[in-house]
Amino acid sequence: MDILFSLFISMAMFTFGIIGILIKRNALIVFMCVELMLNAANLLFVAFAAHWGNETGLIWVFFVLVVAAAEAAVGLAIIINMFRSKQVVDVDQYNLLRG
């Protein structure tokens, strides 16, 4: 696989993630766009690791996946608490983070 193709796909995924974060107001959609951006970075790590024949990129992918799993657990817990407290997951309506 050509490195430019992988770079283009990764760049497109990352761009779609940024656009989704800037346009959408649903907290779950924003969360999924952040995960899309992390997967774009993982694709880039794998592409460069395959291109250069170095396994370091694959190790970084493993660490990014571990961090993404922890982020998913914390992020979904926050979204569930947002819905339980005010019955909305719209980030515009839920802008005050008070105890």
Swiss-Prot record:
Protein name as annotated: NADH-quinone oxidoreductase subunit K
Q: Which parts pass through the membrane? A: 3-23, 28-48, 59-79
Function as written in the Swiss-Prot or TrEMBL entry? NDH-1 shuttles electrons from NADH, via FMN and iron-sulfur (Fe-S) centers, to quinones in the respiratory chain. The immediate electron acceptor for the enzyme in this species is believed to be ubiquinone. Couples the redox reaction to proton translocation (for every two electrons transferred, four hydrogen ions are translocated across the cytoplasmic membrane), and thus conserves the redox energy in a proton gradient.
Q: What is the top EC class of this enzyme, as a single word? A: translocase
Q: Which molecular function GO terms apply here? A: NADH:ubiquinone reductase (non-electrogenic) activity; quinone binding
The record's principal subcellular location, in a coarse class, is: membrane
Q: Which GO terms describe its biological process?
A: ATP synthesis coupled electron transport
Question: What UniProt keywords apply to this chain's record, in alphabetical order?
Answer: Cell inner membrane, Cell membrane, Membrane, NAD, Quinone, Translocase, Transmembrane, Transmembrane helix, Transport, Ubiquinone
